[in-house]
């Protein structure tokens, strides 16, 4: 089966399923629970591959009148074969995206779920740098920037969620005369968590427009 669900759509589905679980815990009226369940199913169904066995199994799993968080956590991974995974770049491929970095720290690939990644981000605590690989149409853009050591509670410019954010600043060339400017914003310190919260890629593209190198 050809994967058709994007990572941010997968995150959106998960958020709606988790909201359904929360509603089950908060709402005692059986009829109201059935209405909320029907609304959730109606929302997530268009994202799913039509007629696929995993779609049928997933929707069937949403039918019980009470769905626990533990049950939801087991149900959601059923969709992963239908989710487009983020590519696992080789050391050489990453080196081409960050040509000016001599000793590029590699991402901790083993700890990442590629089905959850709309973009790739990892920290180099030794140099206080953060590296981002962001899709841009049919290619990928590598962004290297300074990551402030301080973490605050705030809204992430990428996932638009309140959490632990740090100031990320990149240096970009603004003209052919050698003029440079520093641009950035507050983003999640933990990029894996950021991806799990990202349901709309537009904010990511807006962020890229601010920090990307200018041609």
Model-derived segments and spans:
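General detector of N-terminal leader/presequence modules that precede the first folded domain
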Residues: 1-96
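Generic preference for well-ordered secondary structure
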Residues: 1-4, 24, 28, 59, ...
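Sequence-level detector for tyrosine residue identity
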Residues: 8-10, 24, 43, 119, ...
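Generic hydrophobic, helix-prone segments enriched in Leu/Val/Ile
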Residues: 13, 17, 132, 204-207
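Generic alpha-helix signal with a bias toward terminal, lower-confidence helices
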Residues: 29, 36, 56, 79, ...
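Short N-terminal helix-initiation segments at or just after the protein's N-terminus
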Residues: 66-80, 125-137, 208-213
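Long, positively charged binding patches that form subdomain-scale interaction surfaces
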Residues: 93-163
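Cys/His-clustered metal-coordination modules, chiefly Zn-binding fingers
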Residues: 138-215
């Amino acid at each position: 089966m050809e994967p058709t669900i994007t990572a941010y759509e997968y995150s959106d589905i998960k958020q709606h399923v988790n909201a359904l679980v929360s509603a089950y815990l908060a709402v005692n009226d059986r009829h109201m629970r059935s209405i909320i369940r029907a609304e959730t199913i109606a929302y997530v169904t268009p994202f799913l591959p039509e007629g696929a066995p995993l779609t049928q199994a997933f929707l069937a799993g949403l039918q019980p009148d009470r769905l626990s968080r533990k049950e939801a956590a087991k149900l959601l991974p059923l969709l992963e074969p239908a989710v487009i995974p983020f590519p696992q770049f080789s050391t050489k491929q990453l080196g081409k995206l960050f040509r000016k970095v001599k000793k590029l720290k590699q991402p901790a690939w083993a700890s990442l779920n590629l089905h959850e990644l709309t973009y790739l981000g990892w920290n180099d605590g030794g140099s206080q740098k953060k590296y981002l690989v962001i899709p841009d149409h049919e290619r990928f853009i590598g962004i290297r920037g300074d990551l402030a050591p301080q973490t605050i509670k705030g809204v992430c410019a990428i996932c638009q969620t309140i959490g632990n954010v740090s100031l990320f600043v990149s240096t970009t060339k603004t003209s052919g005369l050698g003029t440079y400017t520093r641009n950035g914003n507050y983003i999640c310190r933990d990029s894996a968590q950021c991806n799990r919260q990202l349901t709309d890629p537009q904010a990511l593209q807006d962020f890229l427009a601010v920090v990307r190198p200018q041609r």
